[in-house]
Amino acid sequence: MSIEIARIKKSFGRTQVLNDISLDIPSGQMVALLGPSGSGKTTLLRIIAGLEHQSSGHIRFHGTDVSRLHARERKVGFVFQHYALFRHMTVFDNIAFGLTVLPRRDRPTAAAIKTKVTQLLEMVQLAHLADRFPAQLSGGQKQRVALARALAVEPQILLLDEPFGALDAQVRKELRRWLRQLHEELKFTSVFVTHDQEEATEVADRVVVMSQGNIEQADAPDRVWREPATRFVLEFMGEVNRLTGTVRGGQFHVGAHRWPLGYTPAYQGPVDLFLRPWEVDISRRTSLDSPLPVQVIEASPKGHYTQLVVQPLGWYHDPLTVVMAGEDVPVRGERLFVGLQKARLYNGDQRIETREEELALAQSA
């Protein structure tokens, strides 16, 4: 079932928490709402579920406006971060609960409920724990019970609010893989909230990055990493090096070094330069691609590559994090050379286009 979010705004008193949000989610897609605390991601999820009401705008499921429908009428499954299991009920009864409280005309027979719950217990690999109570379960087991309970009523849309946030790292990884496999099998439309970049990019078909009530970028996970649409996305998604400097003519001035850009940007003045660790050119010998001297202050072998922290020698004050391929690990104190050719330049939040981008803009004008 598709979800259409059309010009949603939400205020709490004088505080605007969602600013004219629009997003289309095709049927069967798994979408991550990713952002820091206060970005509006959980509020948006709750509005989709009907647990909060928007100040303006519309929510449509498969073309039908559900904006005024109560949460129970929207027929979505919702999984909370802290499980929200009934402590006095067994695992079996927790999963069955949603079926037992359906209106009489929609309620399955006791035999059908038993069959359904048994199938769900097998699916979430907890059949042997059917008679246990929540207090007797691990965090990962509780989350599986919560997910099975949400799936019991056969929702066409599944919503999850930081479903793995309360679990330890190893259990989170296992449950992420399991949820992705389950999604592939059942093909339900799913939206989940997370602040974990790795979780979002590993599980979701599409990542929606949010900040201060706005959507910064909605894209495939790899594109969000490699082609960030805004400065916020660039800085939020993983580690990035930032250097401050100035563009003058066709050169970038950083500290005591002048680095030729190979073209003269339309913008001239102060800029911030950004490179992810793997975008920094690095070698043991100086060259046109790697002219800037650095000294290794930390080296962390990672198998087929080494993550380095290097200190620029005479041309910048802050250390950089870089990645060097190969098994020949540099040692602390070793002198290397880096290049910044793959950098992105920003003036505040405004991206400074490369020569190719400026030419493309001129041709399209």
Curated annotation (Swiss-Prot):
<dbReference type="GO" id="GO:0102025">
    <property type="term" value="F:ABC-type thiosulfate transporter activity"/>
</dbReference>
<protein>
    <recommendedName>
        <fullName>Sulfate/thiosulfate import ATP-binding protein CysA</fullName>
        <ecNumber>7.3.2.3</ecNumber>
    </recommendedName>
</protein>
<comment type="function">
    <text>Part of the ABC transporter complex CysAWTP involved in sulfate/thiosulfate import. Responsible for energy coupling to the transport system.</text>
</comment>
<keyword id="KW-0764">Sulfate transport</keyword>
<dbReference type="Pfam" id="PF00005">
    <property type="entry name" value="ABC_tran"/>
</dbReference>
<dbReference type="GO" id="GO:0015419">
    <property type="term" value="F:ABC-type sulfate transporter activity"/>
</dbReference>
<keyword id="KW-0997">Cell inner membrane</keyword>
<dbReference type="InterPro" id="IPR050093">
    <property type="entry name" value="ABC_SmlMolc_Importer"/>
</dbReference>
<keyword id="KW-0472">Membrane</keyword>
<comment type="subunit">
    <text>The complex is composed of two ATP-binding proteins (CysA), two transmembrane proteins (CysT and CysW) and a solute-binding protein (CysP).</text>
</comment>
<keyword id="KW-1278">Translocase</keyword>
<feature type="domain" description="ABC transporter">
    <location>
        <begin position="3"/>
        <end position="237"/>
    </location>
</feature>
<keyword id="KW-1003">Cell membrane</keyword>
<dbReference type="InterPro" id="IPR003593">
    <property type="entry name" value="AAA+_ATPase"/>
</dbReference>
<keyword id="KW-0813">Transport</keyword>
<dbReference type="InterPro" id="IPR005666">
    <property type="entry name" value="Sulph_transpt1"/>
</dbReference>
<dbReference type="GO" id="GO:0016887">
    <property type="term" value="F:ATP hydrolysis activity"/>
</dbReference>
<dbReference type="InterPro" id="IPR003439">
    <property type="entry name" value="ABC_transporter-like_ATP-bd"/>
</dbReference>
<keyword id="KW-0547">Nucleotide-binding</keyword>
<dbReference type="InterPro" id="IPR008995">
    <property type="entry name" value="Mo/tungstate-bd_C_term_dom"/>
</dbReference>
<feature type="binding site">
    <location>
        <begin position="35"/>
        <end position="42"/>
    </location>
    <ligand>
        <name>ATP</name>
    </ligand>
</feature>
<comment type="similarity">
    <text>Belongs to the ABC transporter superfamily. Sulfate/tungstate importer (TC 3.A.1.6) family.</text>
</comment>
<dbReference type="InterPro" id="IPR027417">
    <property type="entry name" value="P-loop_NTPase"/>
</dbReference>
<dbReference type="GO" id="GO:1902358">
    <property type="term" value="P:sulfate transmembrane transport"/>
</dbReference>
<dbReference type="InterPro" id="IPR017871">
    <property type="entry name" value="ABC_transporter-like_CS"/>
</dbReference>
<keyword id="KW-0067">ATP-binding</keyword>
<dbReference type="GO" id="GO:0005524">
    <property type="term" value="F:ATP binding"/>
</dbReference>
<dbReference type="GO" id="GO:0043190">
    <property type="term" value="C:ATP-binding cassette (ABC) transporter complex"/>
</dbReference>
